[in-house]
């Protein structure tokens, strides 16, 4: 085929568009275009985003040579770009990269006014980020990962809105975190992942401008001594931690949505109240303004054993409960009674530990011994996720659903998300639901059975089976 008349459409594009296209390519591929012509070499010099990942170059047979090649490549890329403005710089490196090469790279992009800095630095030897990084006047987003030491004399990041710290260490522990946050006057989004503050004397997050906070640690055999969180404008919270010894100050005045996974100290799950370490009361009392709340099964356990009282959740309209075969529902009755405006109740599974202290929301005790708090519940919608996931307890799950339907007069809709690959199972459950129509506490309630695995849906109402 004669290609002599074909046009080079890419090369004929305006330089701004070509440069924009290059910014979406991995840096290794984008850099390779610089050998095509002088024009492409010029264009690459103005690519605003650099994504440099050592793993792209790794070869297990000769890691030393590959690491050296990667370091030389980064040097060439930065030299080629000169002093051109840079928007985003992402660097992912391992132990094979020399620390003395990393510092100049970071300083180079800081001097060029980078606004989005993403550093994944895994080193067996101690590595400290350059102090200039904590005095940047251009950084808007900063992400630091994988074991570096955060050491700084001064911090002032006047434009920083998003800060993500994962598996890093603070030289002065709680004092270091406090100093870092105090130097971020307009911070809005903070993620602290795998930060070992259980070993600190205290931990404090005090940021008046913060809107979103995510904290997570997987340490379960130690508990933090003291945790304070003063965030009056926070609207979203995702919090995973072991119950602290104390919570001197907690301010969630503006909180709208919270995902809480508080855990008892490992080994204390079956202890009595007098044996508990820590007390979650001051923390739980401060989340009472939320509209949407997710509670893990661990948190249900904390509410039972490590919380003096359950607050009134006047604003709560959506509540999600995670169930666990090893954890009871003792705290659930009080939680539902103290949620006077709850509209949607979601269960991630129904199987829980049988106990005579579950109150009146389940069938752990004989039916004749209980008066259901559900009879006065304002809940309009119940969603059951993972229904049928534990097939050995199907009868217990069906009885629990029946109990909900027969005792909740305000219920308008129940949706069951059935985890099954059997059409026969769906048909059987649908038939059982149909037989319950005359016993529903709510005359307007609709029950919908959905199986995504089978792309099937069955709906039952007081008028009978609507569709299948």
Swiss-Prot record:
Can you say what this protein is called? F-box/LRR-repeat protein At4g14096
Q: Which residues form the F-box domain?
A: 7-60
Q: Does the keyword Repeat apply?
A: yes
UniProt KW Transmembrane helix keyword: no
Family annotation (SMART domains): FBD, FBOX
Keyword annotations from UniProtKB, A to Z: Leucine-rich repeat, Repeat
Per-repeat ranges for LRR: 114-136, 138-167, 169-194, 216-241, 292-323, 324-349
Taxonomic superkingdom: Eukaryota
InterPro entries named in the record: F-box-like_dom_sf (IPR036047), F-box_AtFBL13-like (IPR053781), F-box_dom (IPR001810), FBD (IPR006566), FBL60-like (IPR055294), LRR_dom_sf (IPR032675), LRR_FXL15/At3g58940/PEG3-like (IPR055411)
């Amino acid at each position: 085929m004669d290609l002599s008349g074909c046009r080079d459409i890419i090369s004929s594009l305006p330089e701004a568009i070509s440069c924009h296209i290059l910014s979406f390519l991995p840096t290794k591929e984008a850099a390779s275009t610089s050998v095509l012509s002088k024009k492409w070499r010029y264009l690459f010099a103005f690519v605003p985003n650099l994504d440099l990942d050592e793993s792209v170059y790794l070869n297990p047979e000769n890691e030393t040579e590959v690491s050296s090649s990667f370091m030389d490549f980064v040097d060439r890329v930065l030299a080629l770009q000169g002093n051109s403005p840079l928007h985003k710089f992402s660097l992912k490196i391992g132990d094979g990269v020399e620390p003395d090469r990393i510092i100049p790279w970071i300083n180079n992009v800081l001097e060029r006014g980078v606004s989005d800095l993403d550093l994944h630095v895994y080193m067996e030897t101690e590595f400290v980020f350059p102090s200039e990084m904590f005095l940047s006047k251009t950084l808007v987003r900063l992400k630091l990962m994988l074991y570096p030491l955060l050491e700084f004399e001064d911090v002032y990041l006047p434009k920083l809105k998003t800060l993500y710290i994962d598996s890093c260490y603070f030289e002065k522990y709680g004092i270091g975190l406090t100093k870092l946050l105090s130097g971020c006057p307009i911070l809005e989004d903070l993620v602290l992942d795998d930060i070992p503050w259980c070993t600190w004397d205290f931990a404090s997050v005090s940021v008046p401008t913060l809107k979103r906070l995510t904290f997570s640690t997987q340490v379960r055999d130690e508990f933090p001594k003291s945790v304070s969180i003063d965030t009056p404008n926070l609207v979203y919270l995702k919090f995973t931690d072991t119950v602290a010894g104390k919570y001197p100050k907690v301010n969630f005045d503006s909180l709208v949505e919270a995902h809480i996974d508080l855990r008892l100290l490992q080994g204390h799950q079956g202890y009595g109240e007098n044996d508990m370490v820590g007390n979650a009361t001051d923390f739980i009392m401060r989340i009472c303004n939320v509209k949407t709340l997710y509670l893990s099964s661990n948190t249900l356990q904390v509410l039972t054993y490590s919380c003096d009282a359950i607050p009134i959740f006047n604003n709560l309209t959506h509540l999600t409960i995670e169930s666990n075969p090893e954890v009871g529902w003792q705290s659930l009755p009080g939680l539902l009674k103290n949620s006077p405006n709850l509209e949607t109740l979601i269960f991630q599974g129904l199987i829980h530990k049988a106990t005579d202290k579950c109150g009146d929301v389940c069938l752990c005790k004989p039916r004749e011994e209980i008066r259901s708090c559900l009879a006065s519940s304002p809940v309009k919608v119940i969603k059951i996720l993972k229904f049928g996931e534990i097939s050995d307890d199907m009868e217990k799950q069906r009885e629990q659903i029946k109990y909900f339907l027969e005792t909740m007069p305000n219920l308008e809709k129940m949706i069951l998300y059935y985890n099954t690959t059997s059409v026969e199972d769906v048909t059987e459950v649908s038939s059982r639901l149909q037989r319950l129509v005359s016993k529903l506490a709510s005359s307007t309630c609709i029950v919908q059975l959905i199986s995504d695995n089978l792309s099937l849906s069955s709906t039952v109402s007081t008028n009978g089976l609507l569709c299948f």
